């Protein structure tokens, strides 16, 4: 319709930038009814029109993107397709942290571009019949349209960061107060008591850091107790990480490794522990990378029958799966996963004596932290306030029941779409997360990015997922509803069909 190209009999044209374009498309059933093309590789189309944008645009930027080729089939132009297409395009731009957008705007839509926030920076270019306005949008400047898009409701299937309840959010706005005050000491004691009840452990200790710190502090205890020889179990990414961490602590570890998402052979484990000279066993309870809830009851029974110390990374199971850790020696978790508070507080539950560590960095000394009532150093009061409030949700089993209910509902919906869910032994299927193994002809990166521009956020970018073409849906987020699950399944169906 804009006569910038010569006519041809096929009425088809391959864009000269096609191989580097990112396309945002609008579909109705199986029909593509609208599209937008983006490119973040220079030279842009506008570079060629101006013989280099930077000769005329004098502002600064670090990560530019060009928007081109807006096209909507005629019968859909008076529908919401344009608005929705613009929204998805800017969702992509915002989510990927671009700081400026360039366009060659058609003169007939200058008013619309200005409404969105674009500004002219050069005189018109092109021909009399196909005239364009070089324009830019500074994505770091105040913009009501972009602000509204940034505040749009999001559907969260990520395993973190998690949704926060309103009362937890309120605690984050409180005035900070001293970690040495009586108020903070009382708050911390109360928080520790709640954690000990939920985990069913003798002692809880809180450190200022991520869940990795909790595991590191446990490893420091093992080393300090002279428990140098260990067996680390791994059947996923986080078990593999434990192997690397224990070695960094100069612990002598063997790795009982099985395939990604496979179950441990309990008879073989028993044999390994009987024949080996092991002081401790370390494993992940809920292996998030695959969605397997390792049979901790059976493993604990075997390990303790040998008189061996047992340490558990329960970062993604605590708060999501009701479980008593009474029979393990150490358990690591954090504030930022299924407890549904803000990340930043590492938690260690223990059912054994914590030993002082004279030759270990003080930050890793659980004995010292515990002796100081989990206030060995500065602790941010708002993080403790938020966690303390979040823990009140575990006075009943409702949180666990909701997670399982949403998991079951989504699982049935994915089955209806014939999407292959990773096969896990029935007894060890985790209700925390569903792992979908996409067919080779469907890109996990494209599916994840397409859901993201629709404000649906899933777990798909981690390298261990990308290399296996896997996507994941987590159910620890408190605000996700069954209606949102239905919406997500509907979007998936429109994107990839019934497979």
Label for each model-derived stretch:
Residues 153-208, 212:
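A glycine-/small-polar-enriched, mobile loop at the entrance of the PLP active site in fold-type I
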Residues 77-91:
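Conserved acetyl-CoA-binding loop-helix of GNAT-fold acetyltransferases
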Residues 93-105:
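Conserved GNAT acetyl-CoA-binding A-motif
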Residues 264-315, 319:
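Active-site phosphate-binding strand-loop segment of PLP-dependent enzymes
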Residues 201-231, 235, 239-243:
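Conserved beta-loop-alpha segment that forms the PLP phosphate-binding cup at the N-terminus of a helix
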Residues 17-19, 31-77, 131-132:
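Conserved acyl-donor/pantetheine-binding loop and adjacent beta-alpha core of acyl/acetyltransferases
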Residues 163-164, 336-412:
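Active-site C-terminal subdomain of aminotransferase-like
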Residues 415, 420-483, 487:
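Conserved C-terminal alpha-helix-loop-beta "cap" of PLP-dependent enzymes
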């Amino acid at each position: 319709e804009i006569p910038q190209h010569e006519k041809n009999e096929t009425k088809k044209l391959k864009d000269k930038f096609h191989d580097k374009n990112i396309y945002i498309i609008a579909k109705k059933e199986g029909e593509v009814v609208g599209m937008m093309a983006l490119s973040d590789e220079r030279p842009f189309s506008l570079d060629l029109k101006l013989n280099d944008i930077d000769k005329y645009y004098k502002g600064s930027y670090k990560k530019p993107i060009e928007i081109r080729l807006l096209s909507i089939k005629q019968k859909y132009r008076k529908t919401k397709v344009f608005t929705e297409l613009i929204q998805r395009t800017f969702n992509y731009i915002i989510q990927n942290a671009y700081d400026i957008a360039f366009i060659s705007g058609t003169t007939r839509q200058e008013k619309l571009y200005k409404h969105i926030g674009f500004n002219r920076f050069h005189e018109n270019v092109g021909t009399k019949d196909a005239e364009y306005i070089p324009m830019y949008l500074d994505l770091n400047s105040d913009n009501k349209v972009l602000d509204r898009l940034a505040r749009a409701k999001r559907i969260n299937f990520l395993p973190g960061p998690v949704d926060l309840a309103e009362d937890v959010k309120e605690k984050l706005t409180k005035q900070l107060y001293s970690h040495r005050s009586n108020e903070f000491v009382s708050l911390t004691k109360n928080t520790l008591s709640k954690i000990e009840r939920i985990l069913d452990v003798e002692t809880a200790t809180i450190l200022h850091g991520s869940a990795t710190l909790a595991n590191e502090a446990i490893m420091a205890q093992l080393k300090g107790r002279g428990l140098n020889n260990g067996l680390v179990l791994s059947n996923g990414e986080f078990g593999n990480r434990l192997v690397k961490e224990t070695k960094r602590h100069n612990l002598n570890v063997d790795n009982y490794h099985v395939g990604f998402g496979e179950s441990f052979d309990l008879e073989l484990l028993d044999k390994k522990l009987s024949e080996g000279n092991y002081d401790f066993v370390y494993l992940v309870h809920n292996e998030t990378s695959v969605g397997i809830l390792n049979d901790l009851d059976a493993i604990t029974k075997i390990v303790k029958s040998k008189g061996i110390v047992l340490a558990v990374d329960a970062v993604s199971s605590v708060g999501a799966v009701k479980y008593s850790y009474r029979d393990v020696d150490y358990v690591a978790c954090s504030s930022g996963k299924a407890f549904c508070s803000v990340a930043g507080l590492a938690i260690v539950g223990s059912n054994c004596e914590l030993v002082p560590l004279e030759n270990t960095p003080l930050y890793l000394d659980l004995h010292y932290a515990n002796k100081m009532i989990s206030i060995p150093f500065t602790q941010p009061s708002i993080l403790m306030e938020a966690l303390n409030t979040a823990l009140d949700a575990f006075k009943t089993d409702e949180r666990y029941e909701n997670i399982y209910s949403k998991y079951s509902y989504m699982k049935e919906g994915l089955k209806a779409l014939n999407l292959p869910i990773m096969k896990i032994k029935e007894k060890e299927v985790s209700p925390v997360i569903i792992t979908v193994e996409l067919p080779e002809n469907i890109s996990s990166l494209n599916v994840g990015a397409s859901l993201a521009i629709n404000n649906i956020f899933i777990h798909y970018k981690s390298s261990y997922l990308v290399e296996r073409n896997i996507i994941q849906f987590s159910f620890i987020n408190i605000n996700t509803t069954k209606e949102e699950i239905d919406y997500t399944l509907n979007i998936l169906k429109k994107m990839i069909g019934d497979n």
